[in-house]
Design a protein with these regions (language model features):
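Sec-dependent N-terminal signal peptides
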Residues: 1-5
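N-terminal secretory signal peptides
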Residues: 14-78, 161-164, 175-202
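A short, solvent-exposed beta-edge/loop patch
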Residues: 17-18, 108-152
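Short, internal acidic amphipathic alpha-helical interface segments
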Residues: 20, 80-122, 154, 165-176
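Soluble non-cytosolic domains of exported or imported proteins
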Residues: 24-32, 90, 94, 130-137, ...
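Sec-exported extracytoplasmic/periplasmic mature domains
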Residues: 39-43, 145-159
């Protein structure tokens, strides 16, 4: 096998990272640890006011796309945050529920749902024992690549989906359960403290984003009309 991999004409793919020391460890998702990584990636960001849990959130812009990172599962109350909710909001007059279901069934890395004024695309990351710097970059790269896919799939849906009560309906519960399993968090069985915390964060994600979107100004939403071809 080794010989065949080294044979002439066969090249092993090399992942190129923008970040230095990609195998180095980010201890957790506290802003003090995550901020320098965002700086190194050239992502513009600022800490926002503390949320209801007393944790400051990050508002960031990359390639013209506004997104938010909310440290979660904070072992120290407002620090030692070993989870991170990353999401972007998009304005849309209507969005098809069929399109939402189809997208969520096709892409496990992110999930989407309706929000006031449009829809959201979100991702949850875990760093119980730290996370490689390169993995943070890869996660953000994948998240942003799928934002383009989501916009193409969800923009201009024919029927409007009401956001009222969506976070509590059966479809959302099934998606949260699937997301938990995809992250290695078994649902409805005894779990470690960290696993239980992550599951709680995943379950409350739609309601958290819905409330955030309802209170946010228009400047928090990305305008899909500006995307070429839309």
């Amino acid at each position: 096998l080794a010989a065949s991999l080294c044979a002439p004409g066969i090249a092993l793919a090399q992942v190129q990272y923008e970040i230095a020391n990609p195998s180095g460890t980010v201890r957790n998702f506290d802003i003090a640890n995550l901020g320098p990584v965002l700086d190194e990636l050239g992502i513009q960001w600022q800490a926002t006011d503390q949320n209801q849990d007393g944790v400051s959130e990050i508002r960031a812009v990359r390639d013209g796309i506004i997104f938010f990172i909310v440290p979660a599962a904070c072992i120290g109350g407002t620090s030692g945050c070993v989870g991170a909710q990353t999401f972007a909001l998009f304005s849309a007059a209507s969005v098809s529920q069929q399109a939402i279901n189809a997208f969520n069934a096709s892409y496990a890395f992110v999930s989407t749902g309706p929000a006031p004024k449009g829809y959201y695309v979100s991702r949850y990351d875990i760093a119980d024992f730290g996370i490689a710097r390169g993995n943070v970059e890869s996660s953000l790269d994948s998240f942003h690549a799928l934002l383009d896919v989501a916009q193409a799939a969800l923009a201009g849906g024919a029927s409007t989906v009401s956001t009222l009560g969506y976070a509590d309906d059966l479809a959302s519960a099934r998606l949260n359960e699937a997301s938990g399993r995809a992250l290695g968090v078994e649902v409805r069985v005894p779990a470690s403290h960290a696993g239980a915390e992550h599951l709680r964060e995943i379950e409350k994600m739609p309601e958290l984003i819905r409330a955030f979107a309802g209170a946010a100004g228009d400047d928090a939403f990305n305008k899909i009309a500006n995307i070429p071809g839309q």
